[in-house]
Amino acid sequence: DGGNRQFILVTNNENNICEEVTYPRIKKVIEGYNDKKGIPANVKYFKTDYVPYVITDNDKRTLVSKSTELLCISENTFEVIKQNIKKMDFAIFKNAKQYTAIIYDEDSIENCCDELIKINPKHKVVIYVFSYDHSYDELDFETLNFKFDVKPIPEAILNVYRKISKLKRK
């Protein structure tokens, strides 16, 4: 396979096996040891958390902010280009072949587009937009002069949580 490998390791972290053993070992292999050179790779570590039942628009916004990592996993874009944790207006991530923009607030579409124009991506761009009613329009992105796809959020994520909630209530 030419050494091009990807994997996702999932554990309940019993006895802190992931935090104290597995993750540090993988990280050391990547970074290298005193007598051994590292390898060109990366590792990401995520913890899951319970997200309460989604009812209000504010709950939806919280869910979207907690789903950022899921969208990055989905698009395989982990390198942070722009992210304002406090403001939560938009974030931009990339890998060698693609950019992912996540817009948490429709009022930030223009600012995100301005930032993307500054970056001037040479690769595919996927833009996720949080919208209560899908009221954004392709025209909102008319200033972009590169290839991009716009996808709504959190509807797909909310649908998963709706299914889970139905199962829990049965």
Locate the predicted segments by residue.
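Accessory, often C-terminal, charged low-complexity segments
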Residues: 2-170
